[in-house]
């Protein structure tokens, strides 16, 4: 997936109120950008970090700039949680994600489950139905990419919904997109959200599949490249 052009380099001043970030541009101007990430962004929100911003041409937008990338531990990390669904869909359609081939259609944001969630991607075709929930991963400690970076009741709900879909005879997949170049495997962040880790292990034990792929992240493009192991 090509990123919007041009992107604007800057230095992070601070991230606050979850969805706001002050950034100093190359000319010294400080702008307030939209932060499209509701997590804690642990490890990706350090003041002084190099960042890239996109800029909207829509004059009606309150904030023209959107924070897209940050340099974290020597690697570009994609912090925009609105992108992973598109990345996964593109990677399914171009054959990169071999585990999710053979389906004739892909539909986004389909309502499902007893808790009335919206699934990120519903795959339908000859193999049946496959419900795919996508998660963005930017927290890396040592060689392990960890999810979530904050307590996520919504993420817990999604695991329960996927278990229910599997119980009904469909396929359920939790798909982790590691939007940075380090981290050799994905694991639940038990120290941050132990209940999520417990539910993930329970879900996998009950037939939910856990997939993880690394994304190549540059200021020009982001795309999925290789599968990573999920270690529970």
Curated annotation (Swiss-Prot):
InterPro entries: cNMP-bd_CS, SfsA, SfsA_C, SfsA_N. It comes from the Bacteria. GO terms for molecular function: DNA binding. Pfam families: SfsA (PF03749), SfsA_N (PF17746). Belongs to the SfsA family. HAMAP family: SfsA. NCBIfam families: sfsA (TIGR00230). This is Sugar fermentation stimulation protein homolog. It comes from Geobacter metallireducens (strain ATCC 53774 / DSM 7210 / GS-15). The gene is sfsA.
């Amino acid at each position: 997936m090509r990123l919007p052009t041009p992107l604007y380099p800057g230095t992070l001043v601070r991230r606050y109120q979850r969805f706001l970030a002050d950034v100093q541009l190359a000319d010294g101007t400080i702008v307030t950008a939209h932060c499209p990430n509701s997590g804690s962004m642990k490890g990706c929100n350090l003041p002084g970090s190099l960042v890239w911003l996109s800029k909207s041409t829509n004059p009606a937008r309150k904030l023209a700039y959107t924070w897209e990338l940050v340099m974290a531990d020597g690697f570009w990390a994609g912090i925009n949680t609105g992108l992973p669904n598109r990345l996964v869909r593109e990677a399914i359609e171009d054959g990169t994600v071999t585990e999710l081939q053979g389906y004739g259609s892909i539909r986004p944001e389909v309502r499902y489950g007893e808790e009335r969630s919206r699934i990120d991607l519903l795959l339908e075709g000859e193999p049946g139905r496959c419900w795919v929930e996508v998660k963005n991963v930017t927290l890396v400690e040592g060689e392990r990419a960890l999810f979530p970076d904050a307590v996520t009741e919504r993420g817990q709900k999604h695991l329960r919904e996927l278990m229910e879909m599997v119980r009904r005879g469909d396929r359920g997949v939790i798909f982790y997109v590691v939007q940075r170049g380090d981290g050799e495997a994905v694991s639940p962040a038990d120290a941050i959200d132990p209940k999520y880790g417990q539910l993930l292990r329970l879900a996998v034990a009950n037939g939910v599949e856990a997939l993880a792929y690394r994304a190549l992240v540059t200021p020009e493009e982001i795309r999925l490249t290789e599968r990573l192991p999920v270690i529970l």
